[in-house]
């Protein structure tokens, strides 16, 4: 089950990123985290930027509302999205976690 924490008007959750994929997309859930394939390589923060763009587009929030708070140099990342409650976040992300690509 996806682990989401709500604090001070923001939600926090984990991402497992797979850079250099053929397509940028949310592919499901992995051990309480959101599994994300990213087309960008893990060079000069390109994959992190692509991850934030993908999440902002998927959740319908501004790119500036999405921030990687830890794990910028690894596959496992902790992400903060400002302006969503845990309920809103779960409603928006669930269709992407449990649908076929």
Swiss-Prot record:
Q: Name one Pfam family in it.
A: DUF167
Q: Which GO terms describe its cellular component?
A: cytoplasm
Xref: SMART domains: DUF167
Gene3D superfamilies listed in its UniProt record: YggU-like
The similarity annotation says: Belongs to the UPF0235 family.
User: Per its record, how is this protein called by name?
Assistant: UPF0235 protein Cphamn1_2066
């Amino acid at each position: 089950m996806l682990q989401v924490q709500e604090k001070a008007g923001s939600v926090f959750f984990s991402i497992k990123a797979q850079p250099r994929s053929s397509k940028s997309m949310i592919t499901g859930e992995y051990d309480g985290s959101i599994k994300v394939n990213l087309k960008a390589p893990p060079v000069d923060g390109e994959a992190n930027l692509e991850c934030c763009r993908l999440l902002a587009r998927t959740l319908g929030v501004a790119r500036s509302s999405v921030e990687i708070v830890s794990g910028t140099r690894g596959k496992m990342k902790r992400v903060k999205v400002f302006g969503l409650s845990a309920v809103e976040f779960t409603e928006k992300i669930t269709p992407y976690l449990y649908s076929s690509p």
